[in-house]
Amino acid sequence: MIDLTKIQYRVVVMDESKNQYNIKEYIENLGWEENDGELSVRTSFVAKNDKTSKGYLSKIIKPGCLVGVFATDGASQDEEVARGYVETWNPVEKSGGHTLKCTCYDELYKLQKSQDNRYFPSGTGTKSAIEGILDDWEIPQESYQGPNASHGKTVENNKYLSDIIINLLDDAAKKGEEQCFVQARKGKTSVIPRGSNKTVYVFRMDNTQMFSQSISTADMITRVKVVGKADDDGRTSVEATVNGETKYGIRQRIYTRGKDESLADAKSAAQEILDDEGKIKKEIKVQSPDVPFVRKGDLVYVMSELAQSYYYVKGIQHTVDTYSMTMDLELAEPKKEKASSEKKKDYNVGDIVNFHGGTHYVSSYPGSKGYKARVGKAKITIKNGSGKAHPWHLIHTDSGSNVYGWVDDGTFD
């Protein structure tokens, strides 16, 4: 159990020469937030722009400097809870004293501010597509624990990269994969499932300032119509209609079946849309004393007269001056178990498979060198490699892919 009365913070800045300074004693206003629909953590503070032994604070903190926020509970936890590079630098001079206002964003901010054109051929895996974007923008990666669904042909023109990544993860979830998100922690990026936190904090009325619950059908989808590709005249044919809670009225979504997508798969995707967006939306807002270790995507438990259940954190704002935080929560629905008929396919040497794209390695052993390979058809030439880290050996069967080496489980179907 955490003792909130013992929470303490420190703020460390790294200057242009890589020197580090604890500037907490100069900070007047500090907060950080993670918002729904965004990838990056936003940190802001106002500091007294006093003269130090190294000069005025504004001479130490400059645009591009790295700022880290650390918190301790006075016992077992003492860790970095937010970091960012100074993007907005605003020294203010006034008669009552000088101040410095700064806004910082972490490594994922460049994806929120960068547009690109991306083409993913049919069969591209989620992992390959997302890691390709992170590699191109030179964003350090820690781990990938996310989905690796096979996507239909996807063309994204003039789209923000953060939106492309969110769309890929949402599409994978519609195909039955676990809902995941991208998070930067200590300078490295990971793709992880919601609710991956090991410690689940409980919020009760006696340790919380405010609970507010909302129930809404405003954005509810009650019918999905599956259509085929348009003909030369631009007309599309209706191939299936999947109904949900139509008692709330018809709120229709169109799903266009991909060229290489079966009707059964398209209907399954339509059902996933209803499963995800065809429910009454139940959200709750909680204001409580600050628990600085809680992040967006975490699982928490709420006990109040309004609700007693598990929730995912959709957005969170930490305010250090008032030692408080505000969480926007989404009900954590029980995870659906896949049908027993969905058994893992048994692949054998000689099978022709669809490689999702990604990395192929020079050997099956851990630590072997890897190279990027394109999505496409390939033949399994060896299974159960003795090194076990990359157990499958694939060789491409056409010029679409260039895979010729050892690959991981789950990188083909």
Where in the sequence are the language-model features?
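An acidic/polar, Gly/Ser/Thr-rich interaction patch typically located in mid-to-C-terminal regions
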Residues: 30-60, 209-358
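Assembly/oligomerization scaffold segments
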Residues: 1-109, 204-213
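Beta-loop motif signature
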Residues: 343-385
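Intrinsically disordered, low-complexity, charged/polar segments
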Residues: 395-413
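Short beta-strand-centered interaction patches in the first periplasmic/extracellular domains
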Residues: 2, 90, 97-111, 143-218
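Short beta-strand-centered aromatic/proline hotspots
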Residues: 80-90, 309-319, 372-384
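Amphipathic, non-transmembrane alpha-helical segments in extracytoplasmic/periplasmic proteins
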Residues: 44-47, 104, 117-143, 156-183, ...
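Short, solvent-exposed secondary-structure boundary/capping segments
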Residues: 89-106, 319-332, 386-394
